Amino acid sequence: SKTLKLEKDDRNVWKYSFEIPCDSQGTTVSWSMHDDENTAKNIGRETSLHASVLLKEKTAEMNNILAQEIPQFRCSDSKFEDIYYYLWSLHMMYYINVQKGWEMENHTQSAVNNFLGIHRYDACFQIKVGAWARNKQRFAYGNVLTWKHLVENGRYRETQNGHIFLSDNKGVGWHSGAYGGELAEHVLGAWQIYQHTGDRGFIRKCYQGYFRKVFWKNMVGFAMNDAEVGRALEKMAVISGNNSDVDHWKKRINQDPKHLRLMFDQRWEANGHKDYFMGGRNGMLMTNAFWAMRSKHFPREYAERMIHSWALNKEQGFFGEFFPLAMAKKSMSFFNSADDQSFGYTPDTAYFTLDGIFSQGFPRIASDLTLNHLKNYNFHKEWKIPVAPEAYKRDLSLFGDQYSNFNAGKILLFLEGLGGLSYSIPD
């Protein structure tokens, strides 16, 4: 093609671009990846040749999943229905079942064209989305248990004080060199799956050789969820037949109400940021202050002040062209790097922030802000169709992957936030 452009970047990574004509009849573009070049080419070629048949098969498959596997949703405003089912479609289409090496469980991913597979951070909400599918063994368990392979094979980073971190992503026999500590949130996701199933065998698999190992010496919490995770580990210990572990978790993770209140009080208005939680010394104010509201121990009076001072504030706060900006307007002029510009609005920060406001018992404010976000972030006004970009730049132009399961947390905003749904089979 005369429009094909190939070039290497400064890291010797090949990049390409091309243009193809497309009229009202449409055109087919196929993309395939395989360790063997010829196999990849043949798959792509066969897909293009049989596109119509394959499209009908995929449509039938997805219609069946959307009709039989997920909670049904209806709304007087059809665009919210479109968004809901579109986000579920992406989440479900990205499931893979490799059955090799460290990929023995069926699990979702964050993008179709992403060889990096499932991401540790993204799984914090993707695990919980899977808990709402009907077939939990197919759509829920693997999002948790696929990470166990790294622990069983000693593929983790352990600090001198006993903190264990897993890589950002992994595959059949590899893992990345970027490590982080969001696994505490995975524990709560696994517990929600148990609440929706009562499957004690699943909890045993999660606890023995995995969560017990990761948190035994020390624990890194996520957005102040330490107490909730500690309580979940105690329950998992009992369910898995490790009753003697309960005392260990009680000593390891302090759940004393006075201690918990002190942890929040010490971080309130830190570094002189009025009505703000855990603000940094450098003045970069991000939405993660709201994420801590997801803890039931977060003082509600603090939440109310922060919501009115920062969430609803269109001058200095997080209400931009819509809610929420990833960074407060007060900080944006000081932090203006290329990355800051690219990630002006992001789906993960929106989920954690709005979930926090719902959790604190402000349903009207949380609902209004959620609807504001969904109709501006996940519905294209010009195209009149749902969208799921990885991010919007500060100037509202699209950024990154345009079919991103990084938006999966919004499904939880529909079900648990707007719908207020919650259930526990064991209880």
Predicted region positions:
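Catalytic cores of large soluble enzymes that bind and process phosphate-bearing ligands
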Residues: 32, 72-75, 79, 225, ...
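A glycine-rich beta-turn/hairpin centered on an aromatic-Pro dipeptide
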Residues: 412, 426-427
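Aromatic/acidic polysaccharide-binding cleft in carbohydrate-active enzymes
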Residues: 367-408
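Acidic/polar, glycine-enriched structural segments that form the non-catalytic walls/loops
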Residues: 1-114, 200-207, 212-215, 235-251
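The feature captures the catalytic groove of carbohydrate-active enzymes
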Residues: 14-48, 111-112, 159-185, 208, ...
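Extended glycan-interaction surfaces of carbohydrate-active proteins
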Residues: 78-117, 140-178, 214-220, 258-345, ...
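Aromatic-rich carbohydrate-recognition surfaces in CAZymes
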Residues: 52, 59, 114-227, 343-366, ...
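Structural helix-adjacent loops and short alpha-helical linkers that scaffold large soluble proteins
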Residues: 74-84, 97-99, 130-144, 176, ...
